[in-house]
Amino acid sequence: MGWGDRLTAFYASNATHYIGCDPNPNTFKRYKKMIEFWDKLTGGKKTTQIYNCGAEDLPWDEIKNVDCAFTSPPYFSTERYNEGGEKEELQSWFKFNEYESWRDNFYLPVSQKTLDSLSETGIMMINILDPKIKGKRYRSGDELVDMLKDNFMGQVGMRIMQRPQGKSVFKDADGNFDKAAMDEFMKRIYIENVWYFSKDKNKDIFRHIKRNTLENFFT
């Protein structure tokens, strides 16, 4: 549920129903409070369906006709959500502690089930970064597209600001906090892939940003 940002975006959109999940019991409690707040603000015109579990444990047979599915799966060893916290054993990185197990029992099956849950014109967007483990890069993006190639519609780069680090990371030669180094670090931006899939081969959500075709470029 993206720490609640996707839930918030839902209430700011024209969508009428939201489905989400999070295995962390503490953030889940916060989501419930957020829903109470937004429902009061919007007059209770929207409905939500949230589950305190991982995506692999959702009742997928009950989830159908989804118009838009967006997910950013935990990047295996890179994002260890709720580490040391209550019910950490429900997190995908804990349950599947080898890349191949994580891929085969969580990442790819959940992606397939998400695609299956779409309506005939629905879209699925997956933001995933190839994790690097002990110097080896695992091609999560390629593996996803290879599995769902018949429904692959395109890819876009998502611009992301640098994630903050603690002051202890930035020290000068004397061991003191180096604000200039921290400021320089925070100026950095990077690009992450968002892969786009749909059952509808004629759907093109990127058409509004296209200026020309490659064929026309060479004519």
What residues fall within each predicted segment?
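Class I S-adenosyl-L-methionine-dependent methyltransferase catalytic core
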Residues: M1-T219
